[in-house]
Amino acid sequence: MSIVSLLNIDVLNNPAPFGSPYEFQITFECLEPLKHDLEWKLTYVGSSTSFEHDQELDSLLVGPVPVGVNKFVFTADPPTVDLIPASELVSVTVIILSCSYNDREFVRVGYYVNNEYDSEELRLNPPPKVQVDHVVRNILAEKPRVTRFNIVWDNEGEQGEEFPPEQPDADLEDDEEEYGAGEEEEEVEEEVEGETEADAKEDIEAEGEAEAEGDGDGDGDGEDEDLEEASDEEMEVVDDEVGEESEGEDDKEDKDDKDDKKDDK
């Protein structure tokens, strides 16, 4: 967590001639007492192709910093014209306002700056040599680009890093054996459960085979009660037929006897 938070920046003296000082009203909040000062710095980017032309316009140490909301005005000198390439004087560039604590940068604010001539005639027909006296700057204060960095503050540096306690007496091999034994017990239990399921499955299959062999009544004798009843009915029908045949033969014998007696007469 950042101990210092940037709340607001008001760009003063804008637009202004190229040679006028830069002015910023900065508001920030400090959450805890600080041992060191805050260093504010303004940098002018002289070229878009090389860092060699960057100029540090000014720096300011603010401190001691009280806890709470603080406000101050930061003023910086304009850049040196001779250190800027002629082709980069009248163009769009960037200024960077940054703040550091104990040589550690924790916030950076960038602004686009448009440098142009102050008259329409010079803008349409720029002279071969740049007339700096007629150049005005316009900082795009409504569109800043803010970048924040995490740094170590006073309280964080004193606490240091905490690590879990070492355990030199810990025996990893014993732990592995215990874990392995637990796994073996689980495997044995799974095998026993598997055998029980297999036995139950065999019993079900045996019952199915018994039914297929004809023991539909489930009494274990391998016979079906329905089949027994059907057999009794068939036997009655056979007896009736045999009786009818016997009666027919008796009638035939009586008729033959009568015929024999008639012939004797």
Curated annotation (Swiss-Prot):
Cellular component per GO, a single term: nucleus
Region (Disordered): 155-265
Protein family (similarity comment): Belongs to the ASF1 family.
Residue ranges with Acidic residues bias: 155-197, 204-257
Gene name for this UniProt entry: ASF1
GO biological process, one term: DNA replication-dependent chromatin assembly
Keyword vocabulary terms for this entry: Chaperone, Nucleus, Transcription, Transcription regulation
Signal peptide: none
Subcellular location: Nucleus
Pfam assignment, any one: ASF1_hist_chap
Protein name: Histone chaperone ASF1
Single GO term (MF): acetyltransferase activator activity
Subunit structure and binding partners: Interacts with histone H3 and histone H4.
General function of this protein: Histone chaperone that facilitates histone deposition and histone exchange and removal during nucleosome assembly and disassembly.
